[in-house]
A protein has these predicted regions:
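Charged, low-complexity helical/coil segments in non-catalytic cytosolic or luminal regions
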Residues: 2-197, 202
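Short, low-complexity, polar/charged sequence segments that are solvent-exposed and flexible
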Residues: 74-78, 213-215, 224-226, 234-235
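Juxtamembrane amphipathic/hinge helix adjacent to a transmembrane helix
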Residues: 196-221
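Functionally constrained cores in energy, signaling, and assembly domains
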Residues: 10, 14, 31, 214, ...
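Surface-exposed beta-strand edges and their flanking turn/coil or helix-capping segments
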Residues: 24, 68-71, 207-209, 218-220, ...
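C-terminal single-pass membrane-anchor helix
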Residues: 221-246
Length: 246
């Protein structure tokens, strides 16, 4: 079943100055960054956005095969195969559909509390809303691997309950699965985007507008070329001295 309305999850963090504090705290926490990076960056903008997301509830029927190996100290018994079927449910699963922010980046600032969503049009913060350009089917196909990983987790948890500690459990293969019921909603989620520059390049850090959870990109520290040259020179000298005295 499909809900035609566009829902919205409003900002819990609405103060731009608070987001700036979060940003600089995140910068200070970064490791393996260039020397003087924290002093030379320039924060260019801090802006709120509502990003598109499909939130779905899935009911999946699957048949699967599990390989179970008996282990006792050093000795191992023969592998056995368990074939079973399961009804699997996913509730409030996020399928991010933004063309502006990569899906991977949005995944890193999840989850959102979708119990707080309401119909769009009555939001407290005035912020740009990205349109739903990507369709639901494309999003569910993109996330198929992640859904399968959840199936693996469910199956392994079931085995943990059924078998003793002497059993080594391994997810072997999903033979077939079928989504027999699905329900999805169009939801706009709150995001703060911090745009900053360093060494003439632009970088971004995004914050979950509900929880403040962040994810961003920073340049990596490059090993000094002079340092590398000195190390190579010393290695050559050591080898030369070694051969001289042999």
């Amino acid at each position: 079943m499909k809900k035609e309305e566009v829902y919205i999850v409003d900002f819990k963090l609405e103060n731009e100055e608070i987001i700036k504090q979060y940003f600089y705290k995140w910068i200070e926490s970064r490791r393996h960054i260039p020397k003087n990076f924290t002093k030379e960056i320039r924060l260019m903008s801090v802006r709120p956005y509502y990003m598109p997301c499909y939130v779905c509830n899935l009911k999946i029927q699957l048949d699967y095969t599990i390989r179970v190996q008996k282990r006792y100290k050093i000795r191992r018994g023969m592998s056995t195969i368990i074939d079973d079927n399961e009804m699997f449910y996913i509730k409030d699963y996020s399928l991010f559909a933004s063309q502006v922010i990569p899906r991977y980046d949005m995944d890193q600032i999840s989850p959102y509390d979708f119990s707080k969503m309401h119909i769009s049009g009555d939001e407290t913060k005035d912020a740009p809303k990205e349109k739903f350009i990507q369709v639901y089917d494309d999003c569910i196909n993109h996330y198929k691997g992640a859904v399968m990983k959840k199936l693996e987790d469910v199956i392994n948890k079931k085995l943990l309950k059924q078998n003793t500690k002497e059993m080594k459990k391994k997810f072997y293969k999903v033979k077939s699965h079928e989504i027999i019921d699905e329900e999805f909603y169009k939801v706009l989620v709150p995001v703060w985007v911090c745009k900053y520059s360093y060494n003439m390049k632009t970088y971004y850090c995004i914050f979950n507008g509900q929880s403040g959870k962040e994810f961003g990109h920073t340049p990596s520290r490059k090993i000094d070329k002079i340092f590398i040259s000195v190390v190579i020179f010393l290695i050559i000298m050591i080898i030369a001295v070694f051969y001289l005295y042999i």
